[in-house]
Swiss-Prot record:
Keywords: ATP-binding, DNA-binding, Metal-binding, Nucleotide-binding, Repressor, Transcription, Transcription regulation, Zinc, Zinc-finger
Cofactor(s) this protein requires: Zn(2+)
GO molecular function annotations of the record: ATP binding; DNA binding; zinc ion binding
Organism annotation: Thermosynechococcus vestitus (strain NIES-2133 / IAM M-273 / BP-1)
Any one biological process term the GO annotation gives: negative regulation of DNA-templated transcription
Annotated protein name in UniProt: Transcriptional repressor NrdR
InterPro entries assigned: ATP-cone_dom (IPR005144), NrdR-like_N (IPR055173), RNR_NrdR-like (IPR003796)
HAMAP family xrefs: NrdR
Length: 162
């Protein structure tokens, strides 16, 4: 592993431990040339997922883009960062378990909404307003009425396999 400080290629591992719920290994390393310490992560490399946008364009699934959108929806709700990241981890794990390598942005948005509803109704409405492109107050009122009429399902559905 190359040292990020002096770019020397030899280092020794001081400590290794499981991270990100067992999805990666965190290693503390020490450069044998300069003696500085740094952290590396080893992760499983998953098969890339392609997202089919509303207009038909295709782009690679971007975890950070989904995380940003959900974090924006959760702003000022006092939801811990760890819970938000766990929600995104759950969606990403669901995507990797599927037999298909493509997912529509609609499926991705619905998966996020379903999980957000269990986390925070405020975050749910905020995310829905962007995802479903609310045009006015009537859209908010309709969504709030739907929230009140329809109980949240006790278990989370996975993203469609078909």
């Amino acid at each position: 592993m190359q040292c990020p400080y002096c770019h020397h290629t030899d280092s020794r591992v001081l400590e290794s431990r499981s991270a990100e719920g067992g999805q990666s290994i965190r290693r503390r390393r020490e450069c044998l040339a300069c003696g500085r310490r740094f952290t590396t992560y080893e992760r499983i490399e998953f098969v890339p997922i392609t997202v089919i946008k509303r207009n038909g364009d295709r782009e690679s699934f971007d975890r950070s883009k989904l995380l940003r959108g959900i974090m924006t929806a959760c702003g000022k709700t006092n939801i811990p960062q760890q819970k938000i990241e766990a929600l995104v981890d759950d969606i990403e794990a669901d995507l990797q378990l599927r037999s298909r390598r493509e997912v529509t942005s609609a499926e991705l948005g619905e998966a996020a909404l379903q999980r957000l509803r269990h986390l925070s109704e405020v975050a749910y409405v905020r995310f829905a307003s962007v995802y479903r492109q609310f045009q006015g107050i009537s859209d908010f009122v309709a969504e709030l009425a739907h929230l009140q009429e329809t109980p949240a399902s006790p278990e989370l559905l996975t993203i469609s396999q078909s």
